[in-house]
Each structure stands twice: as structure tokens, then as C-alpha cells.
Amino acid sequence: MTTTSAFMLNVRLDNVAVVAIDVPGEKVNTLKAEFATQVRAILKQIRENKALQGVVFISAKADNFIAGADINMIGHCQNAQEAETLARQGQQLMAEIQALPVPVIAAIHGACLGGGLEMALACHRRICTDDVKTVLGLPEVQLGLLPGSGGTQRLPRLVGVSTALDMILTGKQLRARQALKAGLVDDVVPQTILLEAAVELAKKERLAQRTLPVRERILAGPLGRALLFRLVRKKTAQKTQGNYPATERIIDVIETGLAQGSSSGYDAEARAFGELAMTPQSQALRAIFFASTEVKKDPGSDAPPGPLNSVGILGGGLMGGGIAWVTACKGGLPVRIKDINTQGINHALKYSWDLLETKVRRRHIKASERDKQLALISGSTDYRGFSHRDLVIEAVFEDLPLKQQMVAEVEQNCAAHTIFASNTSSLPIGDIAANAARPEQVIGLHFFSPVEKMPLVEVIPHASTSAQTIATTVKLAKKQGKTPIVVSDKAGFYVNRILAPYINEAIRMLTEGERVEHIDAALVKFGFPVGPIQLLDEVGIDTGTKIIPVLEAAYGERFSAPANVVASILNDDRKGRKNGRGFYLYGEKGRKSKKQVDPAIYKLIGVQGQSRLSAQQVAERCVMLMLNEAARCFDEKVIRSARDGDIGAVFGIGFPPFLGGPFRYMDALGPGEMVATLQRLAALYGPRYAPCEQLVRMAERREHFWTNGETDQGN
């Protein structure tokens, strides 16, 4: 059996070798271990051809250079030594590219990430296109790793240590102009002339190393370096709370290379890569990566999707404006907005204008592209322009009769095949569809706020929703750049259902006297991006608590909020950040004054505000209720799999990614430990902590939510 090479060498008449990268049968180029032999064969030919003037590496794919190394390679490593060997092999290959006797140019169009950028860094010069798809970065930290093929050593020497630390510690991706400004690439050109521009660069004599800016040169010296690394360590520890060991190792490895030389740096990089690959944090983060990749490929149902050429939106408020933006500007679909007045339409249009104008100002897109995307959005105060819409999303108030009226109006004014998707966060989809003439075309599509930032959507079919409606709605969500999970039509759906007891318990501890900042800090230390009380302020106390009575009516007392507390807060006109006062006080809009806890909140709820519980106890009380409810959702088939439950929690509410999601975390703790902990908490705090039947059964049978074959890598 003949294997087609992913690297093809062509020597032009002008004696420039062009190496085209095209992984067979894949949409995206990724580096695999078996490619080393192919690359070395090409490098041997290049070294032996004394007439060559230069070499250009370029992708034959339409929209990516190299998107990174194949992460499955790490999953195949049985121990740290094997992972370290993998890194050393990558380092050696990059060193051989760098050692070529003629100028070597990386011609970059599309994603150049991870191992792809490390390969480009091994080239002597880099040139990239000005296309919006072109991004360069080292995102390994997001998988609990560090760049293992020389990236931690070459990048600081090319762009300076502070820029390199920022890129590697955050996984930040630079667009073309940003990369040029940083010194990461030497030129930016239109895609049409990329190859010729790279060839011309390859014909030139090797240029001297780029001179770093004065600031970077100062920071590269012993005194500047010592100060920089001290500050970076402090800032990173505050941000990660010690939950991400990769960040500490990245700092150590870069410092080693600068202080002791490249050889020591490469050695430290390989050892750190091997050790990090075996950490539970990296295994969990890689599992989330594979799970999200699988979800993005999941069509939602076995039926083929229906037509999806244009979309209507009912309501031009915050959610409607955000949905219009992701539909038109991410999905490329024409959008028609209907609102009861022109102010609503103008608000939605301004929402998109502001987001696009920010992109223009940051030079991410051109003004012409902004205008082209805005032209996809139009509006009216009636149903003109709706007759041919394939799908209509309602984003109106949480009022059942109003939403039922919207269904009737859409059925009357739109095509027979038009799907009605409700953005409700709490109302049953079956109730919204109760009077529909075509209930099979009614579905829930729950976005999270702010729509342009939150990656998750819940797709909620009711009992009569057709398979094609599900498939079409999932297809739309993907076009909008979202990660969709299909969940059952039960009160709270999935994300809000597991979030509610978590927030309720935080408020309950507040009534027991725990301080606001202590509760929030405890959950941030556990790994959440913000604490539960701050989250409620950010969402809006009125909005965030509206679902509590719905859940209490459906599931009983375990969802009841502490008596009268929420009412007292709302009656005092405290809505959170949106009106400047909630549990916290906020400075004037536009000012950088920090939020601070409002001392009056304690008097309002009748407590002194003196913390007694440890951070671990606070986190345990909140998180265990969330986990217990997630297990119930699994048992009741609210979610289709543990995979969907983990993705929903991580992408929807910021469950700590380094734990892999609630189900992977419960598997790590073990069902027996889960049950024992919940029983202990139930004895202390009441029956709301009683372990659910699913966990008790699993403890008896020693079962897990994830099977062994699903845990570490893509299937």
C-alpha cells in the first residue's frame, strides 16, 4: 500500500525549492509523528542540491498553513519519558530545518498554530497573507502543555521575552498586522502573491537578526529579566490560582533558556513537555478539546437539514441584537429583524455596528468588510421581508402568551417550511408550541449572554419537534460559530438547572453570615472565572433569579432560594452591574474604578458579614449541589451524554476546564466518594444534599459516566 506524502518537493526553474504541505484526506494540515521521515527525505534532497538558492514552505490547503500537531500523539504516550521523547524528536526536526544552508521561508496563509508556528519559527523568515483567516499563535497552554518543538526558545529571541511570555502563557493568536508589528513575520501580502513574494525573499542573502525594540532589549538583560519574571510569576499565580501547572513551567523554561542558553532551554522544554502531558489537568483539557471537536461534528439528528438561506429575528433588544450579529457576521446569512418600534431595530443595528467598528479600529477587518456584513442586516416593524425566511428566532420577553402569539404570527406570515426557534431560558418549548399549527417546526434555541462571546447554545426539541427541525437548527448554530448541545424540554433545560442550586447555595451562605468577597474568592480559587455572587450581578439579579420559581415548581424544595432574600434585594432596586448596584457597587460607566462590595447588603439581609467557613468548605457546598444536579440530568436524559454535559458546563457557565467538566470531575472523585461527601453535607445542611439515585446506583456498581475509551483522545 502506497502512502501519499504530506510534503511534496518541487524545484522551480529559478532554483527555489517549494515544499507544499498537504496532509492527504484531511481538511486541515496537522503534524504527525510519521511525517518526520517524509520531511527528512526532502531536507536531504535540499542539502544535496548545491544549485538551490532558497526554500519555501507553503500549504496546499485552501485556508490553513499548519493548525498544530496531532494531539492524539500525546494520548498514545504511556509515560512522561515517551512524551519527552516525542518533544525531542520535534525539536531535532526543527533544528534540521533551521540548519539548512540556504534561506528558508515560511509562506503562511490561514491558521499557523502550535507545531505549525514552531515549524515557521525554525524557518529563517516568515511572510503571511493579510487574510482574516491568517492567525499565528502557540495555544498549547490551553491543553495544559507548553510548545514542545522549540517554541519556548525561538519565540522570545525573535519577538522579545515579554511579547513571547504573553503569547505562550495565554495562547493568544495574532492576526497578520499584529504579527508584523511584533516582528513575528517579515511581511504581509495579499494571498494572490504569497508564493512569489516568498520566492523573492528566499533568493535574497540571509538578513541579519531583527533588532529588538529598546524595551525588549532592556528586559532581556539580567536586571530587567529578573524584574519581568518576578512580575509575570505574581500576575500568573493570581490569574490561575495555581490550577494550571503549565503556566509555571512555561515561565521556568523560558527563563532557563535566556539565563543558561538555548541548549539548556531545549532540554528543559522537552522535560517539562513530558511531565505536563501526564498531568490530570492536561488530560482533562485535552478531553474537553476532543469533546468539543466531536460536538461540532454532531449533526443533532439523523435527518438531513432543511434549507437555511435566510433568518428572521423577533425583538431587537440585547439578545436579539447579539443573535443578529452572529447570524449575519459569523454565519454570513441575511437577517431581517422585527421589533414593535424603530428604536428596537436601531438598537440591534447599532449593536452590530459597534462590534464591527471595533474590529475595524483594531485592524482585524477593513471598513469595506464591515459595510458588507452590515448590509446583511435589515429591519421593519411588521412582517415585510419574512415570507421567505427559513428560520425565525424569537428573542422577546419571557411571557408565555406573547411567545405563543409569536408562533401564530410566524405561521401566518412565513413559509410553510419556516422553523420557529425560541430563545427562552425557562419556558417549556412544548407549552410555546401548544397552539401551533405546525408544532414539529417549533424548537428552543437558548443563547447565553453576551451572545457574541458565549460559545454555547442549547438546542431544545419538544416531544413533537421533527428530526429535520433539530438538524436545521443545529446547522444554524454551527454557522453562527456556536457549540450546540441538544437537551430535553424540561424545566431549566440543562445549564440553568445545574447553575441554580450553585447560586442558591452561595446566597444561603450569605444569609449565614459569610462575606460576599469570601464566597466569590473561594469559587474563583476552585477554578471558576468569577464567583457565583458576582456572576449573578453580571447576569442581572432580576434576570438571574427569574428562573428559580420555575425550577422550584418543577422539582421541589431543593430549588427554593433563601426566604425573602432575593425579594429584599430586588425591592431595594438592586439589579447588579446594569444599574450600578447589586451585591457590589460599580463606578460610572466607562470609568475603570473597581467594583466593591456594598456594605449595606449585609444590613439589608440582616447579617453581620463575618466569614466562618474555609474557602474549601464554601466551594464544596456550592459545587456538590451542581454536580448532584448534573447527575440527575444525566439520569433523566436531559443531556444525551456525559460529553454534552461537560461541554455544556464548561462552555456555558465556566466550570473549571482543568477538571474536564462535571462528569469527568465526578469520575475522578469516584461515585463512592461523591455519595459519601453528599451524605456528609446532607447531615450538616439538610436533604437538598441527598445524593441522587443515579450516583447511588453508580457507587454500588462502581460505574463511571465516561467509559475508558472516551477519556483521553479523539475516537
Swiss-Prot record:
The record marks E118, E140 as: Important for catalytic activity. Keywords: Cytoplasm, Fatty acid metabolism, Isomerase, Lipid degradation, Lipid metabolism, Lyase, Multifunctional enzyme, NAD, Oxidoreductase. Residues 306-714 are annotated as: 3-hydroxyacyl-CoA dehydrogenase. The keyword Transmembrane helix does not apply. The keyword Iron does not apply. GO terms for biological process: fatty acid beta-oxidation. This is Fatty acid oxidation complex subunit alpha.
